[in-house]
Design a protein with these regions (language model features):
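Glycine-rich portal/gate segments that line the openings of hydrophobic small-molecule binding cavities
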Residues: 29-30, 39-83, 131-146
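Hydrophobic beta-strand positions in extracellular immunoglobulin-like domains
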Residues: 11, 55, 104-106
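Beta-strand/loop substructures that line and gate deep hydrophobic ligand-binding cavities in soluble
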Residues: 78-131
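A short, structured loop/turn motif at beta-sheet edges
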Residues: 12-15, 43-46, 69-73, 90-99
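Intrinsic-disorder/low-complexity, polar/charged segments enriched in Ser/Thr/Lys/Arg/Asp/Glu/Gln
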Residues: 2-10, 48-50, 61-63, 74, ...
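Amphipathic alpha-helical segments that line or abut small-molecule/effector binding pockets
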Residues: 16-19, 130, 134
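Hydrophobic ligand-binding cavity/cleft-lining segments
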Residues: 1-46, 146
Length: 146
């Protein structure tokens, strides 16, 4: 079984400006560095990318190699090695600009302890997502978009 944390934030900037930043892993990941550690591995022939991503879930790092697909207004990644996890970043229209939604799914092993760890991980991941979204919002609203 897996657990998913989903959080959203409204960014008071045009959708195309927000989507350009939020769906470019090379720009987004340094902005949300509080989520964990990220290292670019390479671009594949089909235009997708591989990254090593280790997410901070409490005192442990979960993650491994991921396959990243970026097509504005969405960015997704799926683990190909290491802890099973995935992420969806989606930018949608909002009357005040754009809404950025991040959904992180983590699957941990084990039966009873695995379920307990997933429940704890969902809360921690949710707080990291909120912090990352606020960093992104602040960068777009008050800093200069890259």
């Amino acid at each position: 079984m897996a657990t998913t944390a989903t959080e959203s934030v409204v960014v008071r900037r045009p959708l195309d400006v927000v989507a350009k930043v939020a769906t470019d892993p090379g720009v987004l990941l340094p902005l949300v560095a509080g989520l964990g550690r990220f290292r670019f591995i390479g671009r594949l022939d089909d235009g997708t990318e591989e990254w090593d991503m280790f997410l901070d879930i409490g005192a442990i790092h979960v993650g491994g190699r991921v396959h990243v697909v970026s097509a504005a207004p969405t960015l997704t990644w799926q683990s190909v090695r290491g802890t099973r996890h995935s992420m969806l970043v989606e930018v949608t229209e909002h009357p005040d600009g754009a809404t950025v939604t991040m959904a992180m799914t983590v699957e941990l092993g084990g039966l009873v302890l695995g379920r307990l760890a997933e429940r704890i991980a969902r809360g921690i991941a949710g707080r990291h997502l909120v912090a990352g979204l606020e960093q992104l919002r602040h960068h777009l609203e008050f800093g200069s978009p890259r």
